[in-house]
Amino acid sequence: MDANAILQVVLFCAIILGLTPLLGGYMARVFSGERVLLSVVFGPLERGLYRLSGVRPKEEQHWAAYALSMLVFNLAGLLGLYLILRVQGWLPLNPAGLGAVAPDLAFNTAVSFVTNTNWQAYGGESTLSYFSQMVGLTVQNFVSAATGIAVLVALIRGFARRSARTLGNFWVDLTRTVLYLLLPLAFVTALVLVWQGAPQTLGDYVQAAPLEGGSQVIALGPVASQEAIKQLGSNGGGFFSVNSAHPFENPTPLSNLIEMVLLLAVAAGLTNTFGRMVGDTRQGWALFAAMSLMFVVGLGVTLWQESAANPAMVVAGIEAGGGNMEGKEVRLGVANSAIWAVATTAASNGSVNAMHDSFMPLAGMVPMINMMLGEVIFGGVGAGLYGMLIFVMVTVFIAGLMVGRTPEYLGKKIEAREMKLAVISLLVPPLCILGFGAVALTWPQAAASVQDPGPHGLTEALYAYVSGTANNGSAFAGFAANVFPHNLMIGLAMLIGRFLVILPVLAIAGSLGAKKIVPVSAGTFPTHGGLFIGLLVGVIVVVGGLTYFPVLALGPILEQLMLRSGSLF
């Protein structure tokens, strides 16, 4: 790893650190109902939307009503997107004349975008029309991200309020997230991407004459607008099959830096929002520090592995002074590819600017571990922080047991009900990953979709189900996902991995909101210092990581050992 790579890492981390309090403070004002600068522009539109839809913005909801509103809204989005994909051939803005999407793929895709996963078992430019991309996918990119943030805000209110029966209004939180946060930032980002060279057009595909003769069809479309919210909302689904490795999605070094920053900006800012809304910014910075520590360690391992040559190439006498460049854009290099890979899986985004399948075994394991930990290292917008707060409750529970006190966090007692719900949310991901993956691979058609033998083939299949369950969406590209068993099983894993985690979180929020705040005493465990940060990271690694150690030992760890010994498969 050279000085240039170190400089890129430092610059990226410095930008995220600088944006965290700025975005965090702004979002705290938005979700507290305060007027902000954009209220002049969006205030009348917000009030008009409430009147049109019959929403009473001052009327708050019990956690169960909040959850029901969230489920109904997402079910409507799922059915609407599925219908768009199935009748695509009859809809406008389809210059390539693409037909209807197959039922199983349409189900998988609809679930993917509604759950903020953006798993893509298809090639965007060869499967979906402009209408499907804009009205179907891009709309869900906004509202699925807003759903995650709304759930987080409800949980924060549960910690901040005392003896309260309500958590806010889902429809208000959803609307304010889209209008005051996602839409303005996405609009500005889209303009910057157009300036940098990303297409934004409804015109036909272009016929080109390459130098080697013949003809070539160059796909275009409204790329910049989808790219902006794809990065900002931790969505990740690319307009093109190769995602942000495509020069139309990611044209320049500046666009690459902007898109990398967007991967973590909102998720990092929400830690500061949390601290402000509970009345103690130190709590937010403690969570930010824990996330940053795990992020930097993972990034260090990835850069170390990718900066060195592949041992198999060294044995063969092939010069690889630039590191492991397989599957990477030469214009971006190892450092940018490594930062993006770690950030996109830390952030539940899933977009890529390099092929994770071509990473060295241990480097490819880092993104997978980021997802296996529940994507709490910043995580998806909203989803990452409420996942982290589940681990926080487990941590203070363990700390309370060690000193013989009832666990507390922010003055709220963490009792049996909260712990049972927390354990449910922690058990859902491994059950989906290992269970659905094992069941799917009993089908010969599904097993045949794994294109590589040996431990790497196991890693490809495992990565797919980890990515789907964790609502990430990235993939090891040697895995042929568009077959019925995987479309069905990954679709179910995405649904369960999203909503069977959200529901316990909202139940916890309701339970905490109804409690009184216990005064701080001499025996209260401080949750803003280095001891707590270290204990929290330890709990995440032990509880989240050791669950998967056996299958990791059979996959990337075994592959690394074989590679170092000179054994190929």
From Swiss-Prot:
GO terms for molecular function: P-type potassium transmembrane transporter activity; potassium ion binding. Keywords: Cell inner membrane, Cell membrane, Ion transport, Membrane, Potassium, Potassium transport, Transmembrane, Transmembrane helix, Transport. The chain crosses the membrane at residues 5-25, 65-85, 87-107, 136-156, 178-198, 254-274, 284-304, 383-403, 421-441, 461-481, 488-508, 531-551. Coiled coil: none annotated. The keyword Transport applies. GO terms for cellular component: plasma membrane. InterPro entries: KdpA. It is found in: Cell inner membrane. It comes from the Bacteria. Belongs to the KdpA family. This is Potassium-transporting ATPase potassium-binding subunit. The gene is kdpA.
